[in-house]
């Protein structure tokens, strides 16, 4: 039964080639793996949280996974299909810095109004701390989610209006690599964003 759908149709492959940084072979391999883990072709938030928890065994990744799921689920239907999954994976793993920052911005912008408020930033940072704080030693000025959020806003909110625009977010991250580390909660950078 699973055999009949284990290859992407040519028109789907072409669409994904145009919207990702993956080769045809990589797309086919990812698709096979996706169908193996998600035989229905759709991933629910609970399934996604279980998968995400495997990557963060020493913390509670469920809240952060919900935010990542929401950002992957671009059509807001409550599931992630292969196209949504592979496009987001391409951006987060192979995208240029600006693409990654736009993706991260959309995750932090919880209400989708085009700005990140302090409370939105705090909610994401709290979720990150729940996920990794048991295995990461934080500097004193970042020892709580509130301190980290304040630090990010001090550095990024250049017009002091209490919210971050996409432009402030990208400019702040590009001008100071430590901001990217603050956002990622990953001192070695690169991997998670």
UniProtKB/Swiss-Prot annotation:
Function, as annotated: May be involved in the calcium-dependent regulation of rhodopsin phosphorylation.
Asked if the record carries the keyword Repeat, the reply is yes
Could you list the residue ranges forming a coiled coil in this record? none
The family assignment reads:
Belongs to the recoverin family.
Task: List the GO terms this entry assigns under cellular component, sorted alphabetically.
Answer: membrane
Highest taxon in the source lineage: Eukaryota
- Give membrane topology per the record: Lipid-anchor
Its transmembrane ranges are none
**BP term (GO), one:** regulation of signal transduction
Q: Where in the cell is it found?
A: Membrane
As given in the record, the signal peptide range reads none
| Keywords (A to Z) from UniProt | Calcium, Lipoprotein, Membrane, Metal-binding, Myristate, Repeat
Q: What is its main location?
A: membrane
What is the official name of this protein in its record? Hippocalcin-like protein 1
Q: InterPro entries, per this entry?
A: EF-hand-dom_pair (IPR011992), EF_Hand_1_Ca_BS (IPR018247), EF_hand_dom (IPR002048), Recoverin (IPR028846)
Q: Does the keyword Metal-binding apply?
A: yes
Q: Where is the lipid attached (N-myristoyl glycine)?
A: 2
Give the species this sequence originates from.
Answer: Rattus norvegicus (Rat)
> What does the miscellaneous comment read?
Probably binds two or three calcium ions.
Positions binding Ca(2+) 1 in this chain are 73, 75, 77, 79, 84
Q: Which residues bind Ca(2+) 3?
A: 157, 159, 161, 163, 168
Q: Where does Ca(2+) 2 bind?
A: 109, 111, 113, 115, 120
EF-hand domain residues are 41-58, 60-95, 96-131, 144-179
């Amino acid at each position: 039964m699973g055999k009949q759908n284990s290859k992407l149709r040519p028109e789907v492959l072409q669409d994904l080639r145009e919207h990702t940084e993956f080769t045809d072979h990589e797309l086919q391999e990812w698709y096979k793996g996706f169908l193996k883990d998600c035989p229905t072709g759709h991933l629910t938030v609970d399934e996604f949280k279980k998968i995400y928890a495997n990557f963060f065994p020493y913390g509670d990744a469920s809240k952060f996974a919900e935010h990542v799921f929401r950002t992957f689920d671009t059509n807001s239907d409550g599931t992630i299909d292969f196209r949504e999954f592979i496009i987001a994976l391409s951006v987060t793993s192979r995208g240029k810095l600006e693409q990654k920052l736009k993706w991260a911005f959309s995750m932090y912008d919880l209400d989708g109004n085009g700005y990140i408020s302090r409370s939105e930033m705090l909610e994401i940072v709290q979720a990150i701390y729940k996920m990794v704080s048991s295995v990461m030693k934080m500097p004193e000025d970042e020892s709580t989610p509130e301190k980290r959020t304040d630090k990010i806003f001090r550095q990024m909110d250049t017009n002091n209006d209490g919210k971050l625009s996409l432009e402030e977010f990208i400019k702040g991250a590009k001008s100071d690599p430590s901001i990217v580390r603050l956002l990622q909660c990953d001192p070695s950078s690169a991997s998670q964003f």
